[in-house]
A protein has these predicted regions:
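Protein kinase glycine-rich loop
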Residues: 17-24, 29
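Activation segment signature within eukaryotic-like protein kinase domains
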Residues: 118-119
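Protein kinase catalytic-loop region centered on the HRD/HxD motif
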Residues: 122-134
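AlphaC helix of the eukaryotic protein kinase fold
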Residues: 45-69
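Conserved short submotifs of the Hanks-type protein kinase catalytic core
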Residues: 85-99, 103
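Activation-segment/catalytic-loop signature of the eukaryotic protein kinase fold
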Residues: 81
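Activation segment of protein kinases
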Residues: 6, 52-55, 148-192, 219
């Protein structure tokens, strides 16, 4: 991790980092406490080397603003977007539980009832996003969270894109984005996308839940895609 926990004060004057959770391709995630509302939140910090890239930082900020418009029980909520030490930070709902990826790694495959529950929950979340003009572009088990009570939430709209986006300088349809095993054919080819790409990815996830593997497997991620 790139932050010294012992040196931290309040981020944005109200969020106190508690402990490091995980990191992805663009950001690192921390659990924090909102000292104003006395509740746990997740803080997603853009990685330092990306924070120095003005285009990436601006895309990160714009996507946070777009995702903050989403209000749905199966979508991880975005509360705030701030800057900390020159890095963009998104304040999100903290979800206690584990990812579908963790569950599949442990159990290999799931029963039909749980699979249907996951599928309907994520489909409902995607319907809300698509109605608001956002496509997720990275529907995969690692971005599907399950609470101890069994609630399913779709997380990480980190590479989401507005369906009507014209920011050619900030995101390029000719660049393949997403996780190889769960990409739609149009994503593989770098073609323009709509909500059907997300539904294709969800279908691959549900196939894996039932079969214990994805339907298409190559020797490498590139071959799989």
């Amino acid at each position: 991790m790139s932050i010294d926990e012992s040196s931290l004060g309040l981020i944005g004057g109200r969020y106190r980092l508690d402990h490091y959770i995980d990191r992805g391709g663009m950001a690192e995630v921390w659990m924090a406490v909102d000292t104003f509302l006395d509740r746990k939140v997740a803080v997603k910090l853009l990685k330092p080397h990306l924070a120095n890239d003005a285009q990436v930082a601006e895309r990160f900020r714009r996507e946070a603003i777009a995702c903050a418009k989403l209000s749905h029980p199966n979508i991880v909520a975005v509360y705030d977007c701030i800057e900390f030490n020159g890095r963009q930070a998104v304040i999100m709902q903290y979800v206690q539980g584990k990812s579908l990826r963790n569950l599949l790694d442990k159990q290999k495959r799931l029963g039909p009832n749980l699979t249907v529950h996951i599928g309907t929950s994520v489909a409902s979340a995607l319907d809300e996003a698509h109605r608001e003009g956002l496509i997720h572009r990275d529907v995969k088990p690692g971005n599907i969270l399950i609470t101890p009570e069994g609630k399913v939430l779709l997380a990480d709209f980190g590479i989401a894109k507005a369906l009507d986006s014209t920011d050619a300088d900030l995101t390029n349809d000719n660049i393949m984005m997403g996780t190889a095993k769960y990409l739609s054919p149009e994503q593989v080819r770098g073609k323009p996308l709509d909500g059907r790409a997300d539904l294709y990815g969800l279908g691959l996830v549900l196939y894996e839940c039932l079969a214990g593997r994805v339907p298409f497997v190559g020797e490498s991620d590139a071959d799989t895609a």
